[in-house]
Amino acid sequence: MGQLIFNQPSEDKSALEDAGDFTPRFDDRGLITAVVADAGDGELLMVAHMNAQALALTIQTGTAHYFSRSRGKIWKKGETSGNLQTVKEIRTDCDQDAIWLKVEVAGHDATCHTGRRSCFYRTVTLREGKPMLDIVDDERHFDPQDVYGK
C-alpha cells in the first residue's frame, strides 16, 4: 500500500463545497478535527484530531487512527484495549476542515479511556451560579486499571 497524498485545498470556495476532490484543510499545526459517532445508533463517541498520515491510514486500512497532541504521535484507536474502531463511512464538512467518522467499535464497545462507551458521559449544568458536571452515563464497559494499568 503506497503513501496516500492529499492535494492542497482550492482557494475557490465552490470547488471545496461542490467538487469531487477530497482536499482536507489541515490547521496550522497540520491537524484536522475528527468527530466520531457510532455507525449503528449515531451516538457521539469522541472528538479527536488527525494529521495527514493518520487520515491516510484510516482511509487505507478502514481502522481509525488519530494523532495524539499530548504524546505527539499517531495511535490506532483500540490497539491496547481491543476496542478497535472499524470505519463504515467518512464524511467531510462543507469547507473540508473537519471530518465525521461513522464507526463500529469492537471489543467492549467502549470508546473512552475511562471504560465508558462515549467520552461524552457528563452534562454541564449551572448550580448556584457555578458551572458543574453531572455524570449521566456511568456504565463502564471495562476497568481501565485492568486494561491500561493506570
Curated annotation (Swiss-Prot):
Binds 1 Mg(2+) ion per subunit. It is found in: Cytoplasm. It is an enzyme of class 3 (hydrolase). Pathway: Amino-acid biosynthesis; L-histidine biosynthesis; L-histidine from 5-phospho-alpha-D-ribose 1-diphosphate: step 3/9. One of its GO terms (biological process) is L-histidine biosynthetic process. GO terms for cellular component: cytoplasm. The keyword Magnesium applies. Its cofactor is Mg(2+); Zn(2+). NCBIfam families: PRK00051.1 (NF000768). Homodimer. Belongs to the PRA-CH family. This is Phosphoribosyl-AMP cyclohydrolase. The lineage of its organism: Bacteria, Pseudomonadati, Pseudomonadota, Alphaproteobacteria, Hyphomicrobiales. The gene is hisI.
